[in-house]
């Protein structure tokens, strides 16, 4: 075996044993001693809790107001039906975060996932999955089902507080299991490379719900793990600096026209005659300057001072860089 004693062995995918369409065993080797458990446990946790997928989140059943009820002609109660709907394996086209599918069935017999009506963006991976049973020929059931894209497991109770208070009566929330991985286990066995016999072999045994192939699930889990570990490769401070909110150069009220002060006609006309068009122009004038304005007496001056004071302004203010470019261009 060539290479430095400090170099780590790089594992390779040795075998994929496809037991059926949803169950496979994936073997990787060789791994340095201890790395079998290190990588196996990390991948297992990601596969169980962090894989994105689609799940039923809401359902409306015709004639049903709440989950603690039954429906005539249906063998199961509503809670059992909701539990069965959690088992739907749904694949939704990329780019869509939520879709609605419908189910309408009548007549005695089982109601299965294959009875669901949907468009081309939706695929039911387990069409034989039983949702409920109708007990007589006159029985019928109709429901509207919401499917959303998400990650991990989100109980209905966690979404109650985020839903709108006006959520219609009869819209039932369902615990959402988004992860396409149903079961996952790993084992670490002995491996050998040339004269080294202290190496690990990692065997991952996984079952999915059919919306994702086991090999692809492991690939995605490894990608998630690698992306999370990227931060440890370069430990320099990579925090994004907070963007300081730029304060406007002038208080917006100063940029408003004098007409917004709703002065008397006499006072307003006097100011316009002196080319005082904006409140910012006005507050820079002193009382003495305004009293020199033709036809503007002490009564008008008092009115102007009172109106400015009601807005937290006064005469004789100094404004640097006035007027701003936007006004100067006008």
Curated annotation (Swiss-Prot):
Keywords of this entry: DNA-directed RNA polymerase, Nucleotidyltransferase, Transcription, Transferase
Cellular component GO terms held in the UniProt record: cytoplasm; DNA-directed RNA polymerase complex
Stored InterPro entries: DNA-dir_RNA_pol_insert, DNA-dir_RNA_pol_RpoA/D/Rpb3, DNA-dir_RpoA, RBP11-like, RNAP_asu_C, RNApol_insert_sf
GO molecular function: DNA binding; DNA-directed RNA polymerase activity; protein dimerization activity
CDD domains: RNAP_alpha_NTD
GO biological process: DNA-templated transcription
Key word Nucleotidyltransferase present: yes
One Pfam family named in its UniProt record: RNA_pol_A_CTD
Reactions that this protein is recorded to catalyse: RNA(n) + a ribonucleoside 5'-triphosphate = RNA(n+1) + diphosphate
Family: Belongs to the RNA polymerase alpha chain family.
Domain notes from UniProt: The N-terminal domain is essential for RNAP assembly and basal transcription, whereas the C-terminal domain is involved in interaction with transcriptional regulators and with upstream promoter elements.
Protein name, per record: DNA-directed RNA polymerase subunit alpha
Organism: Vibrio atlanticus (strain LGP32) (Vibrio splendidus (strain Mel32))
